[in-house]
Design a protein with these regions (language model features):
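Acidic, low-complexity proline/glycine-rich segments
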Residues: 1-11
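N-terminal core-binding DNA-recognition domain of tyrosine recombinases/integrases
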Residues: 16-30, 36-123
């Protein structure tokens, strides 16, 4: 899996995402690898390369890039479906979704928060 993750670094959108995350969160090498593994799993799930996912969601216009609503909705639904098939706890499923959403968000595709994890006994 490490080779597949290293190959993902060749994608401009992955580089943009990880650079932005690193500026915000100072990822450890282990956290960086986990993010790459989750994104690789999602891309395999939807059968699309990272750059294709972002290109599909953004459209060039004379005024700049705009978000394609249908594509954004499609990928939001795909992230929800991807989360559901992750083995493990609800917390892990939510974390996988957050990682994939962060990839889109850091590349200019705004999304809703998606599933939230709240331990039992926690109120709003």
């Amino acid at each position: 899996m490490a080779q597949a993750c290293d190959a993902f670094m060749a994608y401009a959108t992955v580089h943009t995402w990880l650079s932005s995350l690193q500026r915000q969160a100072r990822l450890t090498p282990q956290e960086r690898q986990e993010c790459l593994q989750v994104l690789a799993a999602f891309c395999a799930y939807v059968r699309q390369a990272p750059d294709v996912i972002i290109t599909t969601c953004l459209c060039d216009t004379p005024d700049g890039k705009t978000i394609q609503s249908r594509s954004r909705q499609h990928y939001a639904a795909q992230i929800d479906a991807f989360q559901q098939q992750v083995s493990g706890s609800l917390r892990q499923q939510v974390q996988y979704g957050r990682i994939v959403r962060s990839f889109l968000i850091h590349n200019g595709v705004m999304l809703q928060a998606g599933w939230q994890y709240r331990p039992h006994g926690t109120s709003e």
